[in-house]
């Protein structure tokens, strides 16, 4: 009875001879011959020692398989973990013990590290490993490694899948694309199952029920392993996060079934953490004060820029924590997650956040005048903004631009603009702070004479200042000219200058 491995020999051989003799005393040796067609012959032959010898008569075009280096490459690729010695032209081929088949209790850390170095042909030890065995729902053993370094992070090409599929220690598929999800392509190691046939094809793997069960069980255990490191050894996890955070974010977007588990692996900078520290979503929720119903976030190029955003003023006043999204991918991830622990993610720059301070700012007469300024600003800005309104959330800044309900952030819009130059930025909501000195000055000027040129100049520059802060100011020359005009006005009439 021959397997697919033997029959594949006819792909390179025009004829195959098998000479075999039993260990039993005075047994007869036999010669089996076939050209790989529909028949074969068996006849008596001479052989002094017991055992089996297979002779391949190669086709003319397959002479490369007579080269020792070619044969050595094949042996090392497919059979470097077989339990018996292999010799090539009298030389014993180096092989490694399949340590994944051994009990974990008998293996030391150095054994795992040495195996990883051999397996990956590297001098670097792994960051962590996961060794597990399962008999149900399907039998398999696995040994997975997380590297210390991400080659993608170094700017090299996209990492190819690094988990090899074995059956009884024989390589079935190197770098299988079907055993681990795409976002975990950085994971290295082996999966071995006796229930996987040696002749399984790529198409069969994709539709194999056993493979699917292995994949689900293995992924569950690996994500739990990573979460365990995050909980017990944050310093080690921070190194994993530094190298593979984009992979976890990719998974949180693409893997709906495991999205909840992947959300546990995410880390963020925050208004409640030091500059060099990161927090996870579970820690954020634990710190939420009574009355806070949503998880707030704000994006920006760096922490310093975010902390200067006027949108944070109301959150500081109420002592509500805000996640700082420093990676352009972060907002995309939270948009797909939508919620965590039944708490919805909410952009701190959203115009519909119900955090405004109650009551009025100033006396009724002044607020009426401020309302008249709002009407004036709407006329000046026209289609540049969606709305102008009195703010109940600002404490220190004169104004801010907010996103309409469910609208994308300006950071997301800038990415869209980079992808599509014809993309039109959405209209924002401008809120003005009636308690700020600049707004009070503009209210007074409007009450004095709505037609004052300086008032319009201030109004246009007010909006430009917000656009400049957010990096969306398009007409810088006009803005500079306005600033110069304001500076001249501040200097007094020309006849006072000597």
Question: Where are the model-predicted features located?
Answer:
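Conserved GHKL (Bergerat-fold) ATPase module
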Residues: 1-7, 11, 15-498
């Amino acid at each position: 009875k021959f397997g697919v491995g033997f029959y594949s020999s006819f792909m390179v051989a025009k004829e195959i001879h098998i000479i075999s003799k039993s260990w039993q005393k005075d047994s007869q040796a036999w010669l089996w011959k076939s050209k790989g067609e529909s028949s074969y012959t068996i006849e008596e032959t001479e052989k002094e020692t017991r055992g089996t010898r297979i002779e391949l008569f190669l086709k003319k075009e397959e002479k490369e398989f007579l080269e020792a280096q070619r044969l050595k490459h094949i042996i090392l690729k497919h059979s470097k973990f077989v339990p018996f010695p292999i010799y090539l032209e009298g030389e014993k081929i180096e092989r490694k013990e399949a340590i994944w088949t051994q009990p974990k209790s008998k293996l030391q850390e150095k054994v795992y590290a040495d195996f990883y170095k051999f397996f990956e042909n590297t001098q670097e030890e792994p960051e962590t490993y996961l060794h597990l065995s399962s008999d149900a729902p399907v039998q398999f053993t696995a040994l997975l490694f997380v590297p210390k370094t991400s080659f993608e992070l170094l700017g090299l090409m996209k990492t190819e899948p690094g988990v090899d599929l074995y059956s009884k220690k024989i390589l079935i598929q190197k770098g299988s694309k079907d055993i681990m999800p795409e976002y975990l392509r950085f994971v290295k190691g082996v999966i071995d199952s006796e229930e996987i046939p040696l002749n399984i094809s790529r198409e069969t793997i994709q539709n194999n029920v056993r493979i699917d069960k292995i994949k689900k069980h293995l992924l569950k255990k690996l994500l739990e392993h990573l979460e365990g490191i995050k909980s017990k050894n944050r310093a080690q996890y921070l190194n994993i996060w530094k190298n593979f955070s984009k992979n976890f974010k990719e998974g949180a977007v693409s893997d709906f079934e495991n999205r909840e588990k992947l959300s546990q692996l995410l880390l963020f900078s925050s208004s409640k953490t030091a500059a060099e520290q990161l927090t996870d979503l579970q820690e954020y929720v634990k710190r939420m004060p009574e009355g806070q119903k949503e998880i707030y976030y704000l994006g920006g190029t760096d922490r310093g820029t975010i902390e200067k955003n006027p949108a944070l003023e109301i959150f500081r006043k109420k002592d509500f924590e805000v996640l700082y999204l420093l990676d352009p991918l972060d907002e995309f991830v939270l948009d797909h997650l939508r919620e965590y622990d039944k708490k919805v993610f909410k952009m701190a720059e959203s115009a519909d956040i119900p955090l405004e301070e109650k009551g009025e700012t100033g006396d009724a007469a002044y607020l009426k005048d401020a309302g008249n300024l709002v009407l004036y600003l709407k006329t000046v800005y026209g289609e540049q903004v969606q709305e102008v309104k009195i703010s109940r959330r600002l404490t220190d800044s004169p104004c801010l631009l907010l996103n309409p309900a469910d609208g994308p952030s300006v950071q997301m819009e800038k990415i869209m603009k980079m992808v599509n130059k014809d993309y039109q930025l959405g209209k924002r909501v401008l809120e003005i702070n009636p308690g700020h000195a600049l707004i009070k000055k503009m209210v007074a000027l409007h009450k004095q004479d709505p037609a004052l040129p300086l008032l319009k100049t201030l109004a246009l520059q007010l909006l430009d200042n917000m656009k400049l802060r957010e990096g969306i100011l398009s007409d810088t020359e006009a803005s500079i000219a306005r600033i110069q005009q304001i500076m001249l006005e501040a200097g007094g009439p020309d006849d006072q200058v000597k």
